[in-house]
Regions:
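N-terminal loops that bind phosphate or other acidic moieties
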Residues: 1-144
Length: 144
């Protein structure tokens, strides 16, 4: 099973995990690292490293960050030297739900691709969806 570590500004990681588990049920091998404005960056880097070690079952680990280029993302990227670690920036709930569903039976690269696609697919303007009947070109106008 692919491990997941959410690394975000503020408490967002904890709230996203709670929302994901509300949708798909309790998840194993998931950890969160919340980065506050006054946190010591090296302490948070160590926290990320420990979380990777804790959730890694040998199938890889995805570090999910809130915004590419931000401190959480930069810290996560610094962990990519480690084999089997991927970073996916711009985390949202559809991305997490998809990753939770595929991480037991897909290899790391395929799981990341599925999660990224789901994250993009469900970004939508309600007025556009209601007028066109399409959710980002899917034609079904429906959810996941």
């Amino acid at each position: 099973m692919i491990g997941m570590v959410l690394v975000t500004h503020g408490r967002l990681a904890e709230e996203l995990r709670a929302a994901m588990e509300h949708v798909v049920g309790e998840q194993r091998n998931v950890a969160t690292v919340c980065i506050g404005p006054d946190d010591d960056i090296e302490n948070r880097r160590n926290d990320i490293q420990h979380c990777i070690e804790r959730v890694d079952t040998g199938d890889g680990v995805v570090l999910l960050t809130d915004m590419f280029g931000g401190t959480p993302s930069n810290l996560a990227i610094s962990m990519m030297e480690r084999k089997g670690v991927e970073v996916l920036a711009g985390v949202n709930l559809p991305m997490l739900v998809k990753l939770a569903k595929v991480r037991s039976n897909e290899p790391l690269a395929a799981a990341v691709d599925c999660a990224q696609e789901a994250g993009r697919k469900y970004i939508a303007s309600a007025s556009h969806v209601l007028h066109s009947g399409k959710l980002n070109g899917s034609g079904n106008g429906g959810g996941g």
